[in-house]
Structures are given as C-alpha cells and as structure tokens.
Amino acid sequence: MMLHEAVMLEIYRQALSASELTSPRCQSRDSNTSAGAGAGMADVRCPSNESHCSANDRLTPAATPTLTPTEATISPNSVGLPLTATLPPAAAVALLPPQSAAMAAYLAAAQQNHLLLTNPLAAAASLVQHATQQAVVEGEVESPALDFSRKRPKSHGDDDQEEDQEQDQEQEQEQEPDHDVQCDNGPLDLSVSTGKRQESVSPPARKIPRSISADYKSPLPPGSWMPPINPYLAAVAAKTGGLGYSKLAPSEASKALEKMTEMSRLETSPTAARSLGATSSVGAGVPAGASSNSGGRHSAWQSHWLNKGADTAKDVFKCVWCKQSFSTLANLTAHMKETQHCGVQIPSPLPTGGVGTPSAPPPTRLATSASNSACSSSSSSTSSSSNSSKSELNMLIKETMPLPRKLVRGQDVWLGKGAEQTRQILKCMWCGQSFRSLAEMTSHMQETQHYTNIISQEQIISWKSGDERERPTNTGVPSTSTAAPSSPSCTAPSVSAVLTCKVCDQAFGSLKELSTHMAQKSHYKESPAPSASPPAAGTGNPKRGRQNRNEKRKKSLPVRKLLELERSGSNSSLDSALKPLRDFAAATKITCEKCGSKIETALFVEHIRKCLGESIPIPPRRSNAGVDRLPSPSLGLGAEKPPSVLNALEQLIEKSFESRTSRTMTHGGYSEAGTPLGASILKRLGIEDSSDYTKPLMDAQAMHLLRSSFASRDRSASESSSASRVESSYTPDRQQATPHKSPDTPAPPPPPPPTIKAEPLEAEPLVGCDREGCSPRQQIQVKKEFSMEACRESPRSVSKSPAPQTERSPPDNGSLLALNSMFDQLSGVENSGNNNSGHCFNNNNSCSSVSAQKPKAHPLAALQKLCETTDPPSTGLRSASSAGSSTASATLPSANGNDLVAFSWACNEAVLSASNGGSAGDSSIIKCSYCDTPFASKGAYRHHLSKVHFVKDAGEDSPRLKSPAVQSPRSMPLASPRRSASRSPATGSQQPPPSPTISPYDESPQSKFLKYTELAKQLSSKNA
C-alpha cells in the first residue's frame, strides 16, 4: 500500500505541476471551497470540483486529524492561501477516477495507521479520498475528471480573467478606493468573483471569522508554517498568492477594521467609520463576504490545526490587537496595514486612500511589497484623520501587540503585561504620553521640547491643569525671556520655572538677567504683590498658583543672594538696598523729620538725601571719614567697601527698627556714598544723628551688647582682670586725661552731649560698657563720655581733621562727627600713643566715666574705637602688665605700624598673657587679643588672627576696617591702654606708661560686638 500510495501521490504531484491548476484552478476551487462552506455544495461553473472542494473543506478536519503539523501546514496553505493543495488530490482523482476508490481505501488505511503523517501530500491524499467519495455520491466518477479537465481550462481562463481583473483592481486599489472595495470583495481565493459571491454571505461570514478569531488567541511568529510548503505549493502561492493577497488584504483589512473598531475602544472608532464610509459595500457586505470566505477557510484551517492539537497553529496568523486570525500572511499583513494594528503610523503620500482606514506600516517581518503598496495607498487619506487617536491607539497596541509576542519563555509577560510598566516609565511628564521605547520618547522630547518642562511635580500638576491657558500666557508674559517666545509654548513654562522671576513670573534667558531684574525690581522679595499680581492676572489662575509657590521659593532665597542683589541694586540706587525694607514696610511710611512729609520706606533714603544732603556738610564728613576712618577702618570700610554688606545688614536691622531706620536713614542718607553705610552702622549701633532711633537701636542692641559684653567681660575679665584693675587704678588718670583733652578742644564737647541723650547713655553703656567693662559709672557717664569724647576726639579731629569737630558741634552731625573723631582718635590718638579710647574702655567705673567723657562721643565711635582697640585691649590686658610694653605697642599702633608687627605683637601678647595666666587663669589657653576667643595652641591662635583679624591688614585702614582686631594689633598699645590704665594716662597726656594698664573688660564685650559686626560685614561683603 505504501508503494502504491507513494506512486499515486507522485503521479498526482506531476499532474498538478503539469496541469498548472495552481493559481487559476486553485483560486476557483478555493472560491468554490469557500462558497461550498458558506453557500452550498453546488458551483455554477464546476459542481464536481465544487463538491470536491466543499468536501475537502468539510472533510478535511476528519481526514486531517492524523496529519502531522507539517502536513497541516501544507494543507492549510492550500486551503487558506487558496493554494491548490486540496485540488491536486481532486485533480488526481479526476484524472484517475477508476483508482479513486482504491486510493480512498489506501488513504483511509494510511490515515488510520498514521502512515501518511510525514507525507507532505497526505492532505492531498485525504482530499482525494473525500473527492472520490463525493464524486461517487454524485454518481459520476469520471464526470469530475472530465468536468475537471474540461473546466480546468474554463476555470483557468475564468480564473485568469478574474486574476487579471484582480490585478487591475489591485492597481486601482492603489489608485482609487472604489477599486479597493472591489478588491476587498474579490478574493477569498484571491479571485474577485469569489469575493462577490461572498458579499451576500458577508454577515454570517463576519460572525464566523470573529468566532474563529476568538478561537485564535495567541499569535505565533507568522510564516512558521510557510517553509514546509512544497515547491509546487510555493509556485502556486507565488502565482496566485501574490495577486490574491493584495486583493484579499483589503477585504480582510476591512473586516479586521470593523473588528478593531469594536475592540479598540475609542481609538479605532474613527478608523472604523472611515473604513465603513469609504467602503460601504465592503464594510457591510464585502468584508463579510471575505470573512465568510476566510470563515470557510478558517473553519478548515481551524479544524485542521485544532484537531491536530498544535497549540502553535492557533497563533500563526493572528492579529494581536483584535485577536482576529488569518489564513495567510498576506491577509494578516493587509489587516494590520489597514487597521494600523501594527502599532506604527506612516504618512504614506499616495494620492489614493483606497481604504479610509488609518494606515500603519505593517511590521517588517509581516510586510510584503504588495502589502506595503496597499498600506501606503490606504494610509494617505486616513493618516490625517487617525492622528487624533494615534496616541491612544498606540498605547493600546503597545499593551496588546508586542512584536514578537513570544520569543522566549516569559517574554510575553514582559512584552504584554509589562507593557503598562514600560508605558509608565517611558512617559512624557509634560503631556502624559507613553512610549514603547526610549528612542520614541527621546524623539518626542526633541520634537516637542517637553523635556524643558520637567521641573517639579507641583508645577507639572499646575501646568497640566491649565496647560492650554498657560502656554499662551507664558509666551506672552515673559517679554524679556529668551526661551518663552520659542515655538514650543512648553519652553516658556520650563524657562519660567528655572529662570523666572518668582514675583512676576517673567522668564529670562540667563541667571544674570534674572538677577539684574530681581535687583532692579526688588522682586527677590516676598511681598512685592503689586508687581507680581498684574503678571499673575495676565497669566491666569495656574500661573498665580505658581506665583504663590514662586513667592515661597523667593522667600527661601539665600541671604547671600539677597545681599548680592541688594549690592547690585545699591550701585545703581538705594532702592535696591532698601528692597528688604520696602518689602518689610511696603505699606508703611516714614515721616521725614526735616520736612514732616510721610515717605515710603523704599524711597526714604533718597528723600533724606534730598532733604538733608544740602543742609548737612557731607563732603567734610566724608573727607573726615576718609582721614578719620583710615585710623578707624571699621567706619571707612563700612562707608566705602562694605556698602552692600552694610546695606544688607542695615536693611535687616532697619526692618526690625523701621521707625528708627527712617530716622537713621535721614541722617545716614545725607552722607551720600559713605553716609548710608555710616548711617547703617550708626543705626546698628544705636547711634543716630537724631537721638530718637539711636536709643532704640542701642536699646535693642544694647541688650545684646550688654550680654556679649558681660560674657566677654567674664572671659576677658580673667584675661584682663589684672589689666582692668590696673585700668581702674589708671581710671582717674584717664578721667583726668580726658578732661585734659577736652580742654584742648573745649568747643566740640558741648555739642556732643546734646546730641547724645539719655538714650546714648544706654547705647553708650552698651558700647562703653563693652569697652569699659559695662560698669554702671560708665553707662551713666556715657553722656559725659560723648562730651568728653567730643573733647577728646576734638583734639584728634583737630589734628586729624577739623571738619569732624565742626560737624560734631551740630547735634545732628554730632554723632557722626563723634564717630569720625573717634576714628581720628583711634588713628590719631593711637598713632600719638593716646590711650584715651583705652580709658573709655577701662572696665573701672572711674575709667568708664572718664572714657565716657572721652572722644567716644558716639557709641559707634566708641564701638569702632573698640573695634580698632578691642583686640589690643585684650593684648593690652596682657600688655597691661608692662606699661612700657603697652606704651611701645601703643607707639607701634599709633605709628600705624605694619600689620605684620601688629600681628606679631598680638601673638606675643596673647602668649604672654596666657603664660601669665591672663587667659581665664589657664596658661595653656591663649585668648585672642581682639575677640577673646580661646585657643589651645599658638598655631591655632595665629591662624585665627590671620584669617579673622588680619585679613584686610594689607591696608592700614583694612585692619581697622576688618575689625578693631586689625587696628588693635597696630593700636595694640592703644587697646592695651584701653584695657590698661596706660591708655587713660595716654588720654590725659597720651602717656604710654598708663597704657600698660589695660581694661580687658572693655575689650572683651566690645571686641565681641565688634567682631560680630566685622564678621557680619565680611560675610555680607563676601556674599555681596
């Protein structure tokens, strides 16, 4: 049997190859098969063939159960691809009718014995058996052969004609949608006639393929069954399949499109509508007919593969999107192209959108030249319409159709179920669009520049809520922003988020521009609601929300940045310097003491300049400041170098002392360049040309100074307790010395006392107490100190610069003049070896009272003097032990000796005092002569001096400016006189011997405060 069977099969094969039943006949039979499956057993052209085909369609499941997957692959190809695999057996039976019964028996036995499992023609044999049975039933065993042979040419001619028509239609499909409709109708067998026949049966056919598609759930790599096809089947496919695929593809695509429309939720609805509208007959009848044909084929295919139990058979040609199964790769390709189920959209510019369905390029592995052409033709019209739903459709496709779906075990989970995770990860934070790959998201970001908008979650939320409203406003609002006008409106939000003024939401191209804007508009402040509100109104609610957040952020701007902004602003005008004040008291107004008018805080300084600038001799004071401040660099520095720092500190202080600030501004403002700084210093120190704010400032700071002075006094007391005691002994000398000086300049002293009120007493005690140890007498004698200081300073000012004295005489200028005179004293007295300031700083009450009378006309002057001599006092305490050494050191400072000398002196004094137990009685601890900071080693102390007190020692004023510490090294003798009585004698006659008596109490409190001031200045200057 096996031999006979093999011979018969070989004969059949030869007959098939020779007769070329392949394309035309196969198509006709396929059409007959589909017709037989859908319509009935009768065929108008070839009933016998039809009966055979129908029998094959229906019996193939029974006959094929024994077939192996290979055979199955062959037979399905014949059935599904309209290949003549089924027909070759039928043709053979027709050619060999007498042997059909024997063949049937052989085939039955072979199938039962599974002998034909490996035979690629087993399907043909089974089909031959069924065909012979059907032929016998019809009663004409030979008639099928005769009819078949006769009708083969007819059907062949018909098929050729049909194929020609189909080819024409395919060309027309590429050019016209009508032809596409016909093409859709055309092929189950890839023949138009069969498609037309199937149109009537289309509705049930649609249902059938759907059920079949439901059966086919998981897609397998397409073309897996194609390789087993025999050469003759390949030829058949090449001949008929190429033509029929494209024809069949549109119909299948239409059907799949309808299914996709149902299953793609909202994304494919427009696509389905277009497909149905473009092909009404196709959508309603043709796709149905095609589906019926495919349904017949699917039935044979499905039964064949499912009966074989091949799990992979279900997934051979299955749309992963709509789960619809297809008999051929061409059908699936066409379906995916037309329905865009491949997940790719291509804007094919073909003139004819054959099918109004959104077209997407089929996967490369599924794409064929014909399918590509069809896809391009159909995509032209539908690409624009489908753009709206492309993103959502793509998302669904990404979820449902990872290609390939099953490459390795578990990969389907990653590609399918894990798609959601991937979409969440590869998601545009701006528009929320998800992407299947990083490359897609990258291209999206590049095209839309949405990456510029990824700033913060809160901003993302606000932008999402008001995206549409916000974009136009963003572009419009940031007129100066370079990025805002960029084509993608999204750039403006990103720029505004990064380089945007938090007050007015104006975007800037660079940080420098933003800083300039903030400094000029004072938008670095939190409160400028007026400036912020108009832009906010323009931008809309979302922007207002962002504005609020921006205000919060601007609140958190670093002090350094604020100081920088203030400094930059102060260079142009004081408005920027007053920005914090304006913020603090935007609604408050300060009454000008000169004109009595109420002026806004931000504008008060300028007003003061105008009102007081003329009346107050600014140049003399400035010149004095130049001369006097050099001796007392703290003032000079405050006036010149640290304007931004001082302004920043001023503003901070002024905010807390608004009213005082205004007054301070009044007097401080008149010194145009240096005065604001000096005024700010006076304000901080509580020294005001107008005593009103001097007292409050001093009161506020007085407590702090007193505390620091007491603490430092305690610290320095140990260091300079002996020196202070010596000072106390020298205090009378100082007091006397002070009177001696006061006679030298009797005129100036009277004005300072009026200038200095009881408030100055309080303030002065702070300063004086710090300097003098905060003794009660000192506090009480602050007024006298001012007088005495005026007298004492007047000699200095006379020697240094008479202008300061003249200025001091006026009550308003008295404080400033006193300060200048103090600076003069610091420089002049120290240079001349005067220890008057030291007397003022003496901790002893008598010294305090005398020092109060001394040239410390103002707390600020005393403070600056202390700053200059604060460190020396501690050294003075140390040097107080030896008046001669103090005197020598005093001589060095008075001579404005090199910083190096002062530095060496400070180091030596600290070491000596430590060795003498002056530093808290512990010889192992070295205390800074300037700030009383304890150090365990000389190296640490030297480092401290170099980093803190001698940073600006390069200039004579710089040490002083740096801090009393700086000058104190120079005026260490002076400082020591302060702390030591030597200074008080020096005050009287500028006697170096008394200078040895140092009042460490004076230095330590004063030095603390001064150091604090210096550090603040340095910090602000660095920041600024």
Curated annotation (Swiss-Prot):
Residues 159-175 have a biased composition (Acidic residues). It is found in: Nucleus. Gene3D superfamilies: Classic Zinc Finger. Residues 20-35, 796-808 have a biased composition (Polar residues). Keywords: Activator, Developmental protein, DNA-binding, Metal-binding, Nucleus, Repeat, Repressor, Transcription, Transcription regulation, Zinc, Zinc-finger. Residues 786-795 have a biased composition (Basic and acidic residues). Residues 20-40, 138-215, 350-392, 466-489, 519-576, 712-759, 786-818, 868-891, 954-1004 are annotated as: Disordered. Expression in the Malpighian tubules (MTs) and stomatogastric nervous system starts at embryonic stage 10. At stage 11, expression in the head domain is initiated in the clypeolabrum in two bilaterally symmetric clusters of cells. At stage 12, expression appears in the central nervous system (CNS) of the trunk and the epidermis. The staining in the hindgut is maintained throughout embryogenesis. At stage 13, expression is present in elongating MTs. The anterior staining is detected in cells that invaginate into the stomodeum and by stage 15 onwards, in cells close to the pharynx. A zinc finger (C2H2-type) spans 317-341, 426-450, 499-523, 926-949. GO terms for cellular component: nucleus. Pfam families: zf-C2H2, zf-C2H2_2, zf-C2H2_6. InterPro entries: Teashirt_fam, ZN622/Rei1/Reh1_Znf-C2H2, Znf_C2H2_sf, Znf_C2H2_type. Tiptop (tio) and teashirt (tsh) have, on the whole, common activities. Tio and tsh repress each other's expression and tsh has a crucial role for trunk patterning that is in part masked by ectopic expression of tiptop. Both genes share a common activity required for the activation of Ser and svb and the maintenance of en and wg. Belongs to the teashirt C2H2-type zinc-finger protein family. The tsh tio gene pair seems to have arisen from a recent duplication event: tsh has the dominant role compared to tio. This is Protein tiptop. It comes from Drosophila melanogaster. The lineage of its organism: Eukaryota, Metazoa, Ecdysozoa, Arthropoda, Hexapoda. The gene is tio.
